[in-house]
């Protein structure tokens, strides 16, 4: 279904702007929040991401692109990312409990090797086509 929005349409205090070149904008209180031109989206204000406390084992960005997990036992994580998706995982307790990662390619200076976890770790996951990638960002206190 295609919906046509006319330029300078106001909905709930937000204004949608457009021009003949196909550029689309979203304004609130007279400030442009984002602009869509061709295949580029420009954000003029901050982006707020959902933070999710991962209680299960599925790495799924639909729950939030920043996730936290505190381990109370060993865990086997599973891949629920689609191509083009990514997420950040802040993991607590990896030095105490075993963590088994899904099949993936680790991006490291020493080659395709999973990190040695500490008490508190940050890892970024992303998927291109069918390949899951991971990069160890580092530990935190």
Where are these regions (language model features)?
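Exposed extracellular interaction/assembly regions and N-terminal maturation sites
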Residues: 42-105, 119-120, 124-141
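Beta-strand-rich receptor-binding modules of extracellular spikes/adhesins
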Residues: 2-44, 139-140
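Beta-strand-rich interaction surfaces with strong enrichment in secreted/lumenal proteins
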Residues: 77, 111-115
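A conserved acidic, glycine/proline-rich C-terminal tail/linker
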Residues: 105-111
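Short coil/turn motifs at beta-sheet boundaries
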Residues: 17-19, 82, 116-118
